[in-house]
Amino acid sequence: MPKKSRKLLPIYYPIETMARELDARILFSLISSNRGRSVFIGHKSDIARYLIKGSAPSGFYIHKSIAEKQKNRFQKIKSSGHRVLVNDEEGLVYPSANYYNQSRVSKESMKNVEIFFCWGKKHASDVLPIFEGYEKKIVIAGHPRFDLLRSPYIGLIGGGKSRNKFKILVNTNFALYNPDKGRAVKILGREMQEGYNYKKMMARLFKEMIHKISDEFPLCDLVVRPHPSEDIGYWVREVGNLENLSVRREGSAIYELSSTDILIHNGCTTGIEARFMGVEVLSYEPLQPNKWNSGLPHLVSRSVETLDQVIESIRLKKEAELESCQEINEVIKFYIENASGDLSIHRMLQAIEGLENSREKVIAVPWFNKILRLAKKKVSLIRNPGVIPRSEYSLKKCPHLKLEQIEEKLSQYCSRDKDLKMPDVSEPWPRCFRINSIRENV
């Protein structure tokens, strides 16, 4: 009689910012389901609550950061029978290793983490000093967001440039100075204060640049896309009255880029995505010397320091006279492991499979803990039969998902990759969706 295959533990992969993360989570879930593993997605607060109160079966929980404030959350999730992994959404772009390690990394939080996925060799080399003793937990995997820009999935995005008007996209990244309303920003230390002052000055200079571009190119489409953590109202007030301009940030940045001719940014991940897609990229750097605009977004961009250089670069691009930047594939590969070779999703799943097969790290939840979890679940349902409302700021970054929305995106990715089968989707708890393993569909 053939041996029955072992059921794989599910993965919980929460979302904080829908425009940034949803498509990558969908593709991750689709590939995972085809490898025999179910994935739960939903807003991070909903997912964490279900895990901590014992509603969810034991599995792998992937969080977006490993900051000090996550220590207690990780401990609670681990105590509920789950295994904690981290894939930092902000691990690609940061001013310096010192700044990153002070603001986003905690060795105390790492104690309850079993894998810390790094974007590339650069990211890994920056965190290794602070994670001394935990080197085996570090896995260089890249990030699923850049799998979206690889064949065959990039085909879902392209084809948007068959327009009559030349499109200029300006991405802003000044949340430290211009945070969304109701969200406090703590300024800790001299380096962060310097960063605040820099972002404040750059926001003013970007405003002047946007007005200048609008005046010089009145027949072009000009779009300003603020960072998800910024107050979009600031840009509506400052530049929203310009006739040829719109301020928006709906959907993923890569869809906006598909119809863009030239992108202008300052230290933004979108600059890297644009380069992957063949879009001309300008990094506006009027403040020199500038330690705040280092890293890959700067390296993949054409640096311009004056308004005249910005205007001239746009004019040359419109007239098809702007020379392409030199190839920098090796530089990109140093920062983003999945720029070539295996997809990040396959690298992550392989590491998870290895962890699951590792006997010394298998979590055995005592029988009395299981009974306690069931009791907590029943008490929770009695005390709180509904769902906890989320803040206005949280809803701006991640509106409530719908099952049909997930199914539509899954179908789109299946249409691009004929090797993938369409999984079933369910909503086991309010606002939490399960993309079922293909094995469970048959």
Where are each of the predicted segments found?
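Donor nucleotide-activated moiety binding/catalytic core segment of transferases
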Residues: 223-272, 276-277
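Catalytic binding pocket for nucleotide-activated donors in carbohydrate/polymer assembly enzymes
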Residues: 240-242, 269-340
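Active-site and donor-binding regions of nucleotide-sugar-utilizing enzymes
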Residues: 2-3, 7-158, 171-173, 177, ...
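Conserved catalytic-core segment of nucleotide-activated headgroup transferases in glycan assembly
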Residues: 152-238
